[in-house]
């Protein structure tokens, strides 16, 4: 710092007063020293307070629980691609006060236990103290929650044991985590509303803080690292109430068991919903709070059943016992799987896939079936009746439906479908009528015509009667000579 004073002295000599007082030089040197000291202090403080790199988040959960979707949403991406084995992504962390950025590594283990050996690539003995663990539970399938949490907690415990961390170092991690758990203070009491969104925590002196004793079943499974239990798909609670008849008692029973599990591991509990974007920002803030020590001013939330938040260190058995007041058909000590029963699996009846048969083969089969069928009486009786209508003139008239238009002056009754056909009478009438058509004979007043009409009335076949009447009307319109010749032939 001496050269600074010398430089000032030389500058003051030629341009200012010729001689400077000794007292003035001393004060200027002190100001220069304090200026440099403040600059060096600020630089060193920034270096120490820079956001550390190498922080890790390890995520466990069943397949389909939504763990990848959850972390992708926290990352800020709309759609994430699900990987296989061990997925990797990162969370961007920004310190607004110091305008500093860093990335937090996120490792997502596959739901198949076959891939648990990949954990060695995500967390090592050196990086364990920089790791936060998230257990993801699927609230849309609450009957799998406790079994899943126990399974993944065992996998993590097994992996930590395989690291062969020195016992002294492991005990140091456990003591540090237990102290953080015991030193929890309500945000409204301890962190009086910092207006910043995030900021570094200022820890008080150890002399002022008095650690509260741990209760029963609290931190019985101390892993030495922070743990967070995240329940996803909490918007499915309404579906559980409608389809599975869940009541508030069921939801309180689930929450009570989750909170007891969290007490054993010193974990926090948070209900989320990516679909409704519920508690996602809260989850992000709590993660950076536990990982980087940022300010966190949100207290515990237990009012809304689908937006519960229990920070680590806040809960105890007395607070959990409040949920027991709503129990009517279940006891707090009842087994989880005895009350939250897995619904019976509905067997889906899949229609067998049938290959389309070749069209020609299908038609051949139908032809063979028709050939094997015996001829019915209806077919034999109908064939002669269609004989007269086969003539070009009668066929063109369209059958019985066109009779009224052929002879407007003739009133013919419609055939009665209730009268049974007389096969013998039809045959006689058809043959006689064919002979009349071939010879072009017949008279309206002849006995034969009268006989035909009387026979038609006796047989009750209105269709044949209408055809006869139609032909008689046609023949009456013939020339008189044709009528006279036909009458002579009939008499002969």
Curated annotation (Swiss-Prot):
Its main location: cytoplasm. The modification Phosphoserine is found at residues 194, 383, 391, 443, 446. Residues 188-207, 370-423, 437-492 are annotated as: Disordered. GO terms for cellular component: centrosome; cytoplasmic dynein complex; dynein complex; kinetochore; late endosome; microtubule. The modification Omega-N-methylarginine is found at residue 397. Residues 370-383, 437-469, 482-492 have a biased composition (Polar residues). ATP binds at residues 61-68. Residues 471-480 have a biased composition (Basic and acidic residues). Keywords: ATP-binding, Cytoplasm, Cytoskeleton, Dynein, Methylation, Microtubule, Motor protein, Nucleotide-binding, Phosphoprotein, Transport. It is found in: Cytoplasm, Cytoskeleton. Acts as one of several non-catalytic accessory components of the cytoplasmic dynein 1 complex that are thought to be involved in linking dynein to cargos and to adapter proteins that regulate dynein function. Cytoplasmic dynein 1 acts as a motor for the intracellular retrograde motility of vesicles and organelles along microtubules. May play a role in binding dynein to membranous organelles or chromosomes. This is Cytoplasmic dynein 1 light intermediate chain 2. It comes from Mus musculus (Mouse). The gene is Dync1li2.
């Amino acid at each position: 710092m001496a050269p600074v004073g010398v430089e000032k002295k030389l500058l003051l000599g030629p341009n200012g007063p010729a001689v400077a007082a000794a007292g003035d030089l001393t004060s200027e040197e002190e100001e220069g020293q304090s200026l440099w000291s403040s600059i060096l202090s600020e630089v060193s403080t920034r270096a120490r307070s820079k956001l550390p790199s190498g922080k890790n988040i390890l995520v466990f959960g069943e397949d389909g629980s939504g763990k990848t979707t959850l972390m992708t949403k926290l990352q800020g991406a709309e759609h994430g691609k699900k990987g296989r084995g061990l997925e990797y992504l990162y969370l961007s962390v920004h310190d607004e006060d110091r305008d500093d950025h860093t990335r937090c590594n996120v490792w997502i283990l596959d739901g198949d236990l076959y891939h648990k050996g990949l954990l060695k690539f995500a967390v090592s003995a050196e990086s364990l103290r920089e790791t936060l663990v998230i257990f993801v539970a699927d609230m849309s399938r609450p009957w799998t929650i406790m079994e899943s949490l126990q399974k993944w907690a065992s996998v993590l415990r097994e992996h930590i044991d395989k690291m062969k961390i020195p016992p002294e170092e492991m005990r140091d991690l456990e003591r540090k985590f237990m102290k953080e758990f015991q030193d929890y203070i309500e945000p409204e009491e301890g962190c009086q509303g910092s207006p910043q969104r995030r900021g570094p925590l200022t820890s008080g002196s150890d002399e002022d803080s008095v650690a509260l004793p741990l209760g029963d079943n609290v931190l019985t499974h101390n892993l030495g690292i922070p743990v967070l239990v995240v329940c996803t798909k909490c918007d499915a609670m309404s579906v559980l109430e409608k389809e599975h008849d869940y009541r508030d008692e069921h939801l309180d029973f689930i929450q009570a068991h989750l909170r007891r599990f969290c007490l054993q591991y010193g974990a926090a509990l948070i209900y989320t919903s990516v679909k409704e974007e519920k508690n996602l920002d809260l989850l992000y803030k709590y993660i950076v709070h536990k990982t980087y020590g940022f300010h966190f001013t949100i207290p515990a939330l237990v009012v809304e059943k689908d937006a519960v938040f229990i920070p680590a260190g806040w809960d105890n058995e007395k607070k959990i016992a409040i949920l027991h007041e709503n129990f009517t058909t279940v006891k707090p000590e009842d087994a989880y799987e005895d009350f939250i029963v897995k619904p019976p699996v509905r067997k889906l009846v899949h229609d067998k896939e049938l290959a389309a048969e070749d069209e020609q083969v299908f038609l051949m089969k139908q032809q063979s079936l028709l050939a094997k069928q015996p001829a019915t009486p209806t077919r034999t009786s109908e064939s002669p009746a269609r004989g007269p209508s086969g003539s070009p003139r009668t066929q063109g008239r369209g059958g019985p439906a066109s009779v009224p238009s052929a002879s407007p002056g003739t009133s013919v009754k419609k055939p009665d479908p209730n009268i049974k056909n007389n096969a013998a009478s039809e045959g006689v009438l058809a043959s006689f009528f064919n002979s009349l058509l071939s010879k072009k004979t017949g008279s309206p007043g002849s006995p034969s015509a009268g006989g035909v009409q009387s026979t038609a009335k006796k047989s009750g076949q209105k269709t044949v009667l209408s055809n006869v009447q139609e032909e008689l009307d046609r023949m009456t319109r013939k020339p008189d000579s044709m009528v006279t010749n036909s009458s002579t032939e009939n008499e002969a």
